[in-house]
A protein has these predicted regions:
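Substrate-binding/catalytic subdomain of NAD(P)-dependent oxidoreductase enzymes
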Residues: 141-176
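N-terminal helix-loop segment corresponding to the beta1-alpha1 unit
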Residues: 1-147, 173
Length: 176
């Protein structure tokens, strides 16, 4: 699998942030454009509970690693797709980063000084808020799977997740 071993001798050369967020993790690099990489991926999926992908909407389809293909290897799999702008619509193939998703979701319009231009938030909320929504969705999907024995497909667009921050402002704008 090409697992990357821990560098026990030089852990102190990494930042505290890196060490905190990557403690006890292992990594495997797979070339999913190669048949062998896809085969290893599907073997990993066969023994996994959850698969999360965060590519543009067409990437996993083009690789032949759709929910249907993965669930054939493991019918109980929970497959989560997190495209930045969703799987449908005119912007589905756009690449998404936390900062541009914030702007397109309207979050930056809530920042800045009164009468001034909108400002990017100090912290890029796009990525961690998508991860927060992911945790809740996967927890519910695991509970449902424990009841039914069946896996499922979930789509969580990063841009849609950020609208939870602007919802009341959208309602206020549309009513006033």
């Amino acid at each position: 699998l090409g697992l990357i071993p821990r560098d026990e001798h030089h852990w102190y050369n990494k930042s505290a942030y890196f060490n905190h967020n990557n403690r006890d993790k292992f990594a495997a690099a797979l070339d999913l454009s190669d048949t062998r990489g896809r085969d290893v991926f599907l073997k990993l999926c066969a023994v996994s509970d959850v698969v999360v992908e965060n590519f543009r909407s067409d990437v996993m389809d083009n690789l032949g690693l759709t929910y249907e293909a993965v669930s054939a290897a493991n019918p109980a799999i929970i497959y989560v797709s997190m495209p930045g702008h969703g799987k449908t619509g005119p912007e589905k193939d756009f690449v998404a980063y936390g900062s541009n998703v914030e702007q397109l979701a309207g979050l930056v319009s809530l920042s800045g000084y009164e009468g001034g231009e909108p400002m990017k938030t100090g912290f890029s909320y796009g990525d961690p808020m998508a991860g927060t929504a992911l945790v809740g969705a996967v927890a519910m999907a695991l509970r449902q799977r424990n009841r039914t024995g069946k896996g499922c497909y979930l789509e969580l667009a990063q841009r849609e997740n950020l609208t939870m921050f602007v919802g009341e402002h959208i309602v206020d704008y549309s009513m006033n």
